[in-house]
């Protein structure tokens, strides 16, 4: 089975032989791909069913909450931290990003871009929160509590003195222009590092 587009990019970008913590690792799909290339991947996942599935796949995963349990990891415990499609579900995204870069010098952060043109059009035209391929549930059922945009995330990391090493913008599974990312990218993947 093919990896989700953001996970495929992250899997390709993580160097072999590194230590990785996948925060919000889901069923361990990315960890399996990383393990196949010689990465020592560990996972933190809030959903018990996903933890069980990941462990059944042979992955090292603990049940925990990114909002509270990242503090239990020592400084520089990993080479990379990964937070894929999870930032928008955290209580304090700013604190979670700080914790990622405390436990690893670099982090991959991917998220749906709530400023994508379809989202903007749905709000303008219908006056309602949209339901899209990347945001597939109604506003009252969504786990998303912080609707982040590419520009918002750039502002956050700039304010915290965090370096951007690389950015990928995707519309569907295809790259989109960085110049038009604010409104054309359905989701973004940032590789960030301590300042």
Please provide the spans of the model-predicted regions.
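Alpha-helix C-terminal capping/helix-to-coil transition sites in glycosyltransferase folds
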Residues: 16, 76-77, 103
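S-adenosyl-L-methionine-dependent methyltransferase catalytic module, highlighting the catalytic core
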Residues: 95-99, 106-195
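Class I SAM-dependent methyltransferase "Motif I" SAM/SAH-binding loop
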Residues: 24-26
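Conserved alpha-helix/loop element of class I SAM-dependent methyltransferases that forms part
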Residues: 1-17
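A short SAM/SAH-binding and catalytic strip from SAM-dependent methyltransferases
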Residues: 80-92
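Short conserved loop adjoining the S-adenosyl-L-methionine
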Residues: 69-75
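Class I SAM-dependent methyltransferase SAM/SAH-binding core
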Residues: 29-69
């Amino acid at each position: 089975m093919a990896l989700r587009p953001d996970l495929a990019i992250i899997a390709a970008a993580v160097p072999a032989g590194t230590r990785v913590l996948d925060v919000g690792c889901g069923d361990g799909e990315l960890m399996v791909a990383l393990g196949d290339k010689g990465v020592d991947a560990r996972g933190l996942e809030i959903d018990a069913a996903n933890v069980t599935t990941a462990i059944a796949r042979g992955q090292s995963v603990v049940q925990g909450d990114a909002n509270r349990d990242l503090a239990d990891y020592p400084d520089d415990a990993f080479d990379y931290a990964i937070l894929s499609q999870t930032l928008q579900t955290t209580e304090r995204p700013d604190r979670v990003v700080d914790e990622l870069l405390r436990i690893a010098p670099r982090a991959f952060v991917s998220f749906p871009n709530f400023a994508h043109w379809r989202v903007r059009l749905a709000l303008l035209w219908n006056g309602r929160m949209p339901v899209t391929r990347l945001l597939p549930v109604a506003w009252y059922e969504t786990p998303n509590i912080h609707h982040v945009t590419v520009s918002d995330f750039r502002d956050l990391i700039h304010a915290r003195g965090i370096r951007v090493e690389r950015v990928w913008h995707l519309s569907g599974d295809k790259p989109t222009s960085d110049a038009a990312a604010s409104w054309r990218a359905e989701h973004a993947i940032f590789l960030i590092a301590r300042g």
